[in-house]
Structure formats: C-alpha cells, structure tokens
Design a protein with these regions (language model features):
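Residue-level detector of intrinsically disordered/flexible regions characterized by low predicted structural confidence
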Residues: 8, 44, 793-802, 843
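N-terminal export and membrane-targeting signals
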Residues: 8-31
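Extracellular interaction modules
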Residues: 24, 769-772, 888-894
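Extracellular glycan-interacting surfaces
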Residues: 3-5, 28-791
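Ser/Thr/Gly/Pro-rich low-complexity, disordered linker/stalk segments of secreted
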Residues: 782-816
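Extracellular low-complexity, O-glycosylation-prone Ser/Thr/Pro/Gly-rich "stalks"
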Residues: 809-919
Length: 919
C-alpha cells in the first residue's frame, strides 16, 4: 500500500508526539529487557458462534502489497505470508486458500495489523512469530510488538516493544528481520528499525534483550531530510539468517549473519553464537543488502543488494556470493544485455538443488520486472523474458489471472508491455524448500505462483497463476449496497473499486472510464439504483476527470465534466430519483448537476470541503456537514441552509447517512477522543439532533433490511457503546444495541464505511483498512432466510426432497391448507411509495414454490422489487419466489418488498397463492 492511501482514514487515537518515544527509551537500561505484558491471549477462531454471526470477506482476492512469504524449513506446505497493513496469513493446503491470523487486532491497537516480519519455527513447527506495528513516526501512536503463537496462529500472546515498528514504512520488503535459531528454537533474533539495533530472546519470544554488543544499528534513510516523516526513518537492522550446520540440535547456532541498512557496512557475522560480532571483511559497498540467504550445504552466503530499501524504487544493485570457508566474495550480478538498470531483491535458493538460485529486479516498472535464474551458483544466468526484435518480447512464462481477473487493471497489451504485468514491488520470491517446481511470489497487488518452475531449465513454459485466494488486503474508502441484483459497490484504495453482482465471486474488472487508482466516495439513487456516481483520484495518462457516472448499475461508466479548480475527489451524493448529483470536490466549492455530470452549477450557503449526502426519499433534499455544522438543501442542492443544531463534533472522523425509506431521517457519528465524540440522530432533516446516550464513541453508521416484523431499517455501526468497542446492530432505531462481532473478529480500524444489505436482514458489510470488505451474516436467517451450508454435500446434483414433488408445477397449499397475505404501505412520498407483502402459511403442510397474484384497484406501478421475481402487466401483478425463499414451512412466512412510482392508492384486497384464494 502506498503511504498516501493509508493516511486517508484517520487513526482512531490521537497521534502521539515523537518525544513520547524518546522519553520511554531514556528510561531503559543499556541491556533493556521487555517482559510479556500480561501474556494476553488472542484467539483467532474461524467463527463467532456466540454472537450468532459468521464472518468472511467479499471476494476480491488480494488487492495489496505482500512483502514477505516464509516457508517452514521442516514441514511441507506450512507457509506464511505477511502484508504491510492487513495482517498475516497461513496457507491451507487442503483448500488452497490463505487463512487470516490477526483479525483479533482491534481498534486501539490497529497498528498491529502491519506485519514487518514473520518467522516459523523449524524445530517446533506449531510455533510462529510476528513482528507487528505499522508506522515508526507519529502516524501510529502505539509501540510495536512481537506476537508469538504455539498453535500456528490460532491464538497469540503479545510482548510490547519499547519502540515502534514499520510494517508500512519504506524498506518493509527487506528481511526477514525476525528469525528462529534452527538448533535451539528458544532463541530468536529481531532486527529493529530507527536505530534500535539487534534484539534477542532466549525464551521463545516471551522477553527480549537488546544485543548491546552488536556494532551497527544502521544509518540509511530514504530521505534523511524528512525528519520525523515517512521517508526519514533509519531502516535499521533488516535481516537475520543462520548457518544451521554450525551447531548440533539443542545447541545455540554459532554462525549468524545479519544485514544492516548501511551502504558501507551491510553484512555482519558472529561465529560464537552472538557473543561477538564483526563486519565481514571484503564485502561489497555502495548498496544495501536487501536479502541474505545462506546455503548451508555448500557454506555459501548470497546477498541481493539495491541502492534503496524499496519497495517503490531501486535503480542499481548487485548480487554477491560469500564463501564462509575461504572468506572470498564473488560478484555474480547478472548482466542485463538490454541496458536496464535496477537493484536486486527477491533472492531465493532451491533447497533441493542449492546450486540453483533466483533473484528479481528491484525495481523495473517498464516494461516489466525481470526474474533471473542460475543453476550454477550464479556463474551463468537466464532470464524470464527477453526482447526478440523491439517491441516484441519472448516470454518463458504464461500468465493465468482467472483467479483474480481484474489484475489486468483494464489495460490492453501495449508492446513491449503485456497485461497483466508479471509483477512489481516483488521483494518476496520463494522456492518451496520441499518442491523445486513450486514458487510463490508477492507483488503490489497479489501473490502469484507456479508448480512447474524447473521446466524453465529445459526451455519449457512456466505456468504462473494467482495464489492469493483468501488474502483480502484492500483499504476500503466507501461502500454502497443498492437494492436488487447488485449486492455491493465498493470504493477502494489502490485498485479503484468494483461492482459486486455476487459477493462470493471475484469481479472481472475494476471501475473504468474513468479509471481511478483510489475511489474515495460512491453513491446511488435510492429509488432508481441503476444511477450511480463515484469520485476518485485521477491517474496521470488515463483521464483527467475525478468523477464517473453510470445509469446502468455500474455495467458501464463515463467520465463527467469537472467544475473549474477541482484538484481531488472529495465526496459525492446522488438524489433519490437520480435526477441530480451534488459534488463536494477538493480544490473548489460544492456544486450540483442536473445533467448527470455534463455541467455543474455552484451551490450556495455551504462551505467548500463539506461532506455531502442525499436524502433517500425526497429527491429535492441534500445534506452537508463541515466543522461541526449541519446544512440542508431543499432545492436539489442549489442552496443550503445552516442548521441551528449545536453540540455536533467539529473535529475527527465524522460520517453521516440518511435512512432509506424515511424522509429527513439522518444519523451522524464521529468525533475525537478528549473532545466531542458520539452519535446523533435527526428526524427533521437536520434542524435538530438528539444524541444517543449509549454511544460513547460513534464512528460510522449504515442501514440494512429491517428485522422481521419491523418497518425501520436495521442500524449498523462501528462504535464504542456502553464502554465496549465493536460492531453493533440495532433493530429498534437505536433504543437497544447488540454487539455482533467478538474479540476474535475486530479487523483493526473500521471507521471508514459500514452498510447493511437492503435485501437480506442481518447482513452487514464493513470497510477495513487493509482486510478488505468484511461481510457478516446471521448464522441462521430468521423467517424467510434459510441457512445455506458452506459446502453442499452433492454439488453435482440438486438435493432431493424427502417426498418428491412434481418439478413442473409448484405445490399448492393443499386441500386442508390455507394462507394469509399481509399487504402494507410502509412509507410514502410525493410521487412514490414503499410496499411490503408477507405470506403466512397457516396450513399443515409446507409450501414448496410459490406464486402470488393480485390486481391493483388503481393505477399503481411497481418500479423495483426485492426478495421476489415480480412482473406487472397493467394492473395485474405476479410475484414468484426468489429461489432461496421458495419453501414456506407450516406457520412460516415469506416477505418481499417493492417501490412504487405512483401514489399508493387503494390497497388490493384479493390475492391468490398458487391458484388458490388467500385471505
């Protein structure tokens, strides 16, 4: 993830000052010891059964930088991956998916979702360790920590460190900084950033001591002039590796190699188990050793160097081999015949055939990364692609992205560039130590892999495909869940966003025309949901417009015009019937359009930079909020009037939303610690607000389908309520709340976006900052929503009912059965209404498949329906089951809803269900 993208969602805790860290360090003894703080257990269970919810992700697959992949050296198929802001994962060989391991990280310790290093124990393979912390500057108020697990990451204990760590800082792809002694696995080493040196544990990571005799804490910063900023930190001690042959099992390994971010002194060694250290004589200078890998069979250390720590840059570098027996260094840098200059990273050894090594360019943006392979210890090299008459290239690989088809980034082939790219930011590149044919590597957006790597050596084609299934790493900026067939629309950092027709299926392509690298805000017309607008960061060379508009539910988009002075996306709102758009962009004031973005007029009465939203019922109403003041427009965004309401938060992360089906009903959440912070509701279009007393800290709020028997939408929020931080749902407009997540499912910072599903009661979508779009469903949906098994027992054949029915005709209520129909108008406005129909089976046998018919006595017209397949011809209406709600048990119900585009008129009085009259 880029640093800019991750700063956009403000941290939930006030940022600390740099002086806090210096004061803490001044209190430490020379050989500081860090004890386990309370040995806090953090289980990472697969489900939150006690809350009645199951949790998963909207399927995107990847979406962020994977800087580290680590294979266990003793157990096949035990593999871990680390991300810069989205936690760590373990590979599940049975499902071929990655399992998230750090979802227990919560709101207050959100920085622990950034993983700077991970280590898997080669002796006790159930043990795994993670060094966590996201920023070393004051963006992250908390110190870093070392987490340890004895059950492969299912549960964790945490030891806090007296300094910060930078999982999303420059140099994060170097490593691994954390390493387990392969002979005495109670011993671990950790290379720290920021000048804090080398640290050691002798009790399986429970306590840590600084290795005070280690001579060099590093001195390289990406930009030394950026003091206290993102680029200004000393990248420190960057990797540790062992020669396991230098000791017997149970003894401390004697030969230890350490990489340091110092271009003149980049590799150190101990030959006495860490008692003393020396700079290895004769080593190359002028570059940083990004990676160090030891071949213990032949006694050789390989290093891949670059002129920076990456991951975005690196214009020069070398590859060297060190012979531990003779002390000789040999330059084995592959020579690029095309004259490209780049650093090197992604260094790996084939442990089955240790003469085989591979390295990757760090970094080559155009035309693509280069991968080099040697089968003779670097004496000769071959590369994965080469020019065959410019602009054509000969590729040693083919590329299957069917697992995440959006990875082409909407780009066609533009020789010599091909789409998708082979990779970028590839600092993690690892050959399976048990299988020479298998390789996994990380990029800025995914994990790729191959299972036939050695075909390279015989002139064959290496088959590369997506291997990121289960990793969900996007940073969510906004979410919208329209009623109807489309389940969700996402606005994401780095990869733009998607229209999700099915949340269990990876979308084919991200937003296009215009393509936005990061989409900040998205909205749809509540009564005409096919009309949508989104705003995002323009990408140089693609299109200059920050706004995209669709009238077909996101199937296609066009770039809107921009008012003069626009410099960034801001926020956007679409009115209830899709006839107007209000846009509050960066760089200029609020504007409105009545032409779907082809022209704009400045709004008055509202400050520039205000956050805007639309009323979900009245197409003439828009709302805005800025600096503690609420504004309302009743003329389609032309003019806004300042509300007299006081006591609203003027600072912090403030979000608000209007309630579908309820005109003038607004919920506002946000604020800042040690200041005004909470949740407020208005039922008079913002004229007055009432604070919800139970909400201590409100951060984001959204709405979904009402609970059975209720007419008001379910309310969802990420907040602290009655002293407890979590994800909550209210089925009674905020009178009572139930926490629906648990401590094992917190997903760090969740303050950007939340929404319920308008068609499925209980379903909630949660935006995270690095764990993608989390989706929660009730374990057993009440009433019409049957629970679906995770894996159908017989996917090839439909399940037969206990008593076979005639497939060509749905079963009626039966001779002794009966039914009742409730038809209600649950909301209405000037030119429309919302209806809800409930079918009750009052008979003794189940109804399997239903078709309800009625005739409107007036000129009512239905514009949209949900939970049913509905058609209307003149006044005659036919509503059929939606498939999943086809069976109504005795005493059970099935409900569906619709929006009418006329006045509600007189309600129908006669209904037939499967041809039988129904009361």
């Amino acid at each position: 993830m880029t640093p800019t993208d991750q700063r956009a969602p403000l941290p939930p805790i006030p940022r600390s000052r740099r002086g806090v860290l210096s004061r803490a360090l001044s209190c430490l003894a020379t050989a500081a010891t860090v004890a386990a703080l309370g040995a806090v257990l953090h289980p990472a269970a697969p489900a939150a059964a006690d809350t009645g919810y199951t949790w998963g992700n909207v399927e995107i697959v990847g979406g962020g930088f994977v800087p580290g992949i680590v294979f266990n050296q003793s157990e096949p198929d035990l593999i871990y991956a680390r991300t810069d802001i989205g936690g760590a994962y373990r590979w599940n060989p049975d499902t071929e998916r990655w399992i998230p391991l750090l979802d227990h990280v919560g709101w207050d310790d959100w920085g622990h979702s950034g993983v700077v290093s991970i280590a898997t124990d080669p002796v006790d393979t159930d043990r795994v360790y993670a060094a966590v912390g996201t920023y070393t500057n004051d963006w992250d108020p908390n110190n870093g920590a070392i987490k340890r697990s004895t059950d492969r990451g299912r549960t964790w204990q945490t030891t806090e460190l007296p300094f910060k760590l930078g999982g999303n800082m420059p140099g994060r792809g170097m490593g691994e900084r954390l390493a387990v002694d392969p002979n005495d696995n109670s011993v671990l080493y950790f290379g720290a950033p920021s000048g804090h040196g080398l640290w050691k544990s002798t009790d399986h990571g429970a306590t840590w001591n600084e290795v005070t005799n280690f001579p060099n804490p590093g001195n390289y910063a990406a930009d030394p002039s950026d003091v206290g900023g993102y680029q200004g930190d000393n990248q420190g001690v960057v990797w540790v590796t062992f020669d396991p042959s230098s000791a017997s099992p149970g003894q401390v390994t004697q030969d230890i190699y350490v990489g340091v971010a110092d271009k003149d002194n980049t590799v150190y060694r101990s030959t006495d188990g860490g008692a003393t250290w020396e700079r290895i004589p004769g080593q190359p200078t002028g570059f940083l050793a990004q990676k160090g890998v030891f071949d213990h069979v032949n006694g050789l250390l390989y290093i891949a160097t670059s002129d920076t720590g990456g991951p975005y840059d690196g214009s020069d570098g070398e590859v060297w081999r060190y012979d531990a027996a003779t002390g000789a260094w040999t330059d084995i840098t592959p020579a690029d015949p095309d004259g490209f200059e780049y650093g090197f990273s992604g260094l790996t050894i084939d442990r089955q055939n240790p003469d085989t090594i591979m390295v990757v360019s760090q970094i080559l943006w155009w035309p693509d990364i280069q991968v080099w392979r040697s089968t003779d210890r670097g004496a000769t090299w071959s590369r994965i692609w080469e020019f065959s008459g410019y602009p054509n290239r000969t590729l040693r690989y083919d590329h299957d992205i069917s697992g995440a088809p959006w990875l082409h980034f909407n780009n066609p082939d533009r020789p010599p560039e091909v789409s998708p790219k082979l990779g970028w930011m590839t600092q993690a590149f690892e050959i399976d130590p048990f299988d020479s044919d298998r390789v996994l590597y990380g990029t800025g957006a995914t994990v790729y892999g191959s299972d036939n790597l050695t075909d390279w050596d015989s002139g064959g084609t290496v088959h590369i495909k997506v291997r990121a299934q289960g990793i969900e790493e996007t940073a969510v900026q906004d979410l919208a869940a329209p009623p109807g067939a489309t389940e969700l629309v996402s606005a994401l950092g780095d990869i733009g966003g998607f229209v999700h027709e099915d949340i269990d299926v990876v979308p084919d392509a991200m937003f296009d025309t215009p393509f936005h690298g990061t989409t900040r805000s998205i909205d749809f017309a509540e009564l005409a949901p096919a009309t949508m607008a989104r705003v995002g960061e323009a990408v140089s060379g693609e299109v200059d417009s920050h706004i995209g508009i669709s009238t077909d539910g996101g199937s296609s988009w066009w770039a809107g015009q921009q008012p003069p002075g626009v410099t960034g996306p801001g926020t956007v709102a679409v009115n209830a019937d899709g006839s107007r758009i209000v846009w509050s962009p960066d760089g200029t004031g609020v504007h409105y359009s009545t032409t779907l973005g082809s022209s704009w007029t400045a709004s008055t009465g509202v400050p520039a930079g205000a956050r805007v939203e639309a009323d979900r019922v009245d197409p003439d109403k828009f709302y805005a909020f800025a600096n503690g003041t609420f504004y309302t427009s009743t003329d389609g965004g032309a003019t806004f009037t300042e509300s007299a309401a006081t006591g609203l938060p003027a600072r912090g992360n403030v979000r608000f939303a209007a309630v579908p089906g309820h005109e003038g009903d607004i919920w506002l959440a946000g604020g800042e610690a040690n200041s005004t912070y909470g949740m407020w509701r208005s039922t008079d279009s913002g004229a007055t607000f009432t604070r919800l007393g139970d909400v201590d800290e409100g951060d984001v709020v959204g709405f979904g389908k009402p609970a059975p028997g209720k007419s008001y939408p379910a309310v969802y929020t990420s907040s602290k309520i009655n002293g407890v931080r979590g994800i909550f749902r209210s089925d009674d407009a905020g009178q009572t709340w139930v926490r629906i997540n648990d401590d094992q499912h917190q997903w760090a910072w969740t303050g950007a976006a939340i929404t319920g599903d308008p068609d499925v009661y209980g379903r909630v979508y949660i935006g995270t900052n690095g764990r993608g779009v989390v989706v929660g469903d009730l374990t057993g949906q009440p009433g019409e929503e049957p629970e679906e098994p995770e894996e159908p027992e017989e996917p090839e054949e439909p399940e037969e009912p206990e008593e076979p029915e005639e497939p060509e005709e749905p079963e009626g209520p039966g001779e002794d059965a009966s039914c009742a129909v409730s038809y209600q108008v649950v909301n209405q406005w000037g030119n429309g209404f919302q209806g809800e129909v409930t079918i009750t089976n009052t008979g003794d046998s189940a109804i399997s498949g239903w078709e309800l018919k009625w005739t409107f006595p007036g000129d009512q017209q239905i514009a949209h329906a949900w939970n049913t397949q509905l058609t209307q011809t003149g006044a005659d209406v036919t509503a059929r089951d939606a498939g999943w709600n086809s069976t109504i048990a005795p005493g059970g119900t099935a409900s569906f809803g619709f929006l009418g585009s006329t006045a509600p008129g007189t309600a129908p009085s006669e209904f037939t269900l499967n041809g039988e009259s129904c009361s």
